[in-house]
Amino acid sequence: MASPTPAARALLLAAASLLLAAAPATAQSDGEGTVTWSVRPADASGEDGRAWVEQELDPGEAATEYMAVHNLSDTEVVFRLSAADGFFQDNGRFSMLPSDEPSTDAGLWIEVQEEVAVGPDETAVVPFTTTVPDNATPGDHAAGIAASVLSEQAGEDGATVGVESRVGFRVMTRVTGALAPSASIEDVSSSYALSWNPLAPGRAQVTFTVVNTGNARLLVTGAATAAGREAAFPGPEEIDQELMPGDERRFTVTVDDVWPSVFVPATLNVTPVVAGEGEGTPVDTATADAGFWAVPWPQLIALAGIGLLIGSSLWGRRRSKARLEHLLEEAREEGRREAAEPV
């Protein structure tokens, strides 16, 4: 059976890896060698230190940027160049649509040559042009641009499967016009995990969805508060959480050291800010009630146990007192009988 053509392989993708503005990637090429390469934003002379491209354009306007494709391999490589709609994954990382999925937005606005040949340990600076349609809606639009190599791998059934490995970066375009950033909180649910040690508090978990209801890219932060305890999100070790217009993302925040009090008042606050140009522009805070029921069973059981001990002690004391009074009465009666007997 003949090997698939590059076009056919692109349609038979079983997996595609994409690194955006990250460390150089390594992949097996169609040949025998290993290909290592990086792709970063550039100006006409070379890499310019940016992590990705941010641009603000009017409807109908065009702008040219550059990408630097650095071949770190020891042989010449022909890289396939492509642009596609961009999106944020559920974990907050940026990606772009795979080659076999058609773009519908900003990925269609970018024109770039189909391929570029780069010699060993050389860098090619390639221009690309973003042309905003006349009818583009105001606000933020995401795309990605990448250089890729195709390789072949054997599937479990022995068939040859094409794998595309891509390295690229974001191209974030803000179309001028009225910017209306906003966000909402939906589908809030809370749960509580008891500590069966009555002297230790439990922890609450608040799960919710943040929806970007405006037309601007948002950086989302916030906090959940329960019974006076607070937990912020994202955590200090987590990446920034960005939402494109129309995006929604599910979060779970854990609040530690919460005492059960039958009903625990809890509040959720989401404080988004506009990302990109105008970064830090405040947006109305979204607030939602997250109160939940938390019956203090360990404490109630402990109190019940203490109550039983106290009740048992009081009952024992009363019983002892009654027995003592009974014995004293018997002794008095015996004394009276002895006193009544003739001498």
For each of these PLM feature ranges, what is it?
Residues 29-53, 73-125, 221-222, 228-232:
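Surface-exposed binding patches on compact interaction domains or structured appendages
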Residues 100-136, 230-261:
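Intrinsically disordered, low-complexity Pro/Gly/Ser/Thr-rich segments with frequent PxxP/GP/PP motifs
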Residues 38-73, 77, 184-201:
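Beta-sheet-dominated interaction scaffolds and their linkers
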Residues 75-99, 125, 131-182, 258-302:
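Terminal connector regions
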Residues 49-50, 60-66, 123-126, 138-144, ...:
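Short, solvent-exposed loop/turn segments enriched in Ser/Thr/Gly
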Residues 322-343:
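Cytoplasmic C-terminal tails of single-pass
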Residues 1-29, 306-318:
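Secretory targeting and sorting signals
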Residues 177-321:
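Membrane-proximal extracellular "stem/stalk" segments
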